A protein has these predicted regions:
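Glycine-rich, aromatic-bearing surface loops/beta-hairpins
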Residues: 116, 120-208
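Short N-terminal segments
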Residues: 1-5, 90, 207-208
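Short, Lys/Arg-enriched charge-dense amphipathic segments
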Residues: 42-53, 78-92, 177-189
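Glycine-rich loops and low-complexity Gly/Arg-rich segments
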Residues: 52-57, 93-97, 147-151
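Long alpha-helical, hydrophobic tracts
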Residues: 1-69, 74-78
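Long, folded non-catalytic interaction modules
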Residues: 37-42, 58-142
Length: 208
């Protein structure tokens, strides 16, 4: 379904470095800046993508309570008003200035455990016109997929991780679902910087 070279591209940095990491613990999500009905949509997306990946969710992380934090807002400067966020995100003001200058509409920050696996992810979404065009379900699914692994910055630049069925239902693209399943295979490491990891991933995708 995916060649080794295609798998590599999902995790290859512009520098030529191969960078892969997956979650090393159940995902406990919390969402800020949305109404209650949107909250349930996002949590349903987390559960659906974790189920497709073979990963798990939890109500609470024993160390930090919530380990996937998703923030929705209209302007980057709003994050300066979030209590204690500057303690979680180093050099927050400088980062926000860069994102504002670049007119970015999203940004993700990962934290890792001693094995190199993901232990926390912070997702920031500035709801510009491009993001507003997406319905809530699709936006939630896309963002959860992007938070499931440490992807290349270009991984989804030219194609969404979602596909539309003939009946109008939105689902993960089959190759993305297969890639996530391979990434969360218990025999695979939580982190790798070795391009041969892509070969092992591709082999697991092929046999499914």
């Amino acid at each position: 379904m995916l060649t080794v070279q295609e798998v590599e591209k999902f995790f290859m940095r512009p520098s030529g470095d191969y960078v892969f990491a997956r979650w090393g613990r159940p995902i406990a999500a919390v969402v800020f800046g949305v109404l209650d009905e949107s909250l349930s949509i996002i949590k349903s997306a987390v559960e659906a993508v974790c189920l497709a990946s073979g990963h798990t969710t939890s109500e609470l992380d024993p160390d930090i309570g919530s380990n996937l934090m998703v923030f929705f807002f209209k302007d980057w400067s709003e994050l300066l008003e979030v209590p204690d966020l500057e303690h979680i995100i180093p050099n927050l003001e400088i980062l926000l200035e860069k994102l504002e200058t670049a007119e970015a509409n999203q940004y993700r920050i990962f934290r890792f455990d001693e094995t190199g696996g993901i232990k926390a992810c912070f997702v920031f979404l500035r709801m510009d016109n491009a993001l507003k065009k997406l319905n809530a379900e699709n936006l939630a699914l896309i963002q959860v997929v992007k938070a499931m692994l440490v992807w290349s910055d270009l991984a989804f630049q030219n194609a969404s991780p979602l596909a539309l069925r003939e009946n109008g239902e939105t689902v993960l693209r089959p190759e993305i679902a297969a890639l996530l399943k391979a990434a969360y295979d218990p025999t695979m490491p939580p982190k790798s910087n070795d391009p041969s990891h892509a070969l092992r991933m591709a082999a697991r995708i092929t046999v499914r």
